[in-house]
Curated annotation (Swiss-Prot):
Residues 2-58 form a coiled coil. Keywords: Coiled coil. Gene3D superfamilies: 1.20.5.1700. This is UPF0521 protein B. It comes from the Eukaryota. Belongs to the UPF0521 family.
Amino acid sequence: MSLKEVITSLKNDFHSINKEIDSMKENNEKQEEKIFQEIKKLKLEMELLRKDNLSFKTTIQSLSDSINSLSSVESTYDSDIYYNDDEYSTIYL
């Protein structure tokens, strides 16, 4: 092989390697964009879950407050239970 052929072959190899590198860069950029979009989507989902969690906590607190309120009202009454024909009724005195 002559020197000219060797140089031409090396140039071709160099160009092929550069094309492959460019292709890899492009693929990496596409992957980075996909990852970025996925992260963005996950952040949005996380924020929605936080809001749902806060709403759930608020609902639970409201229910707890209602139960406590009902318990305090119930405890103000003295009650006796009378049984009549296998049924019972509560009589508040």
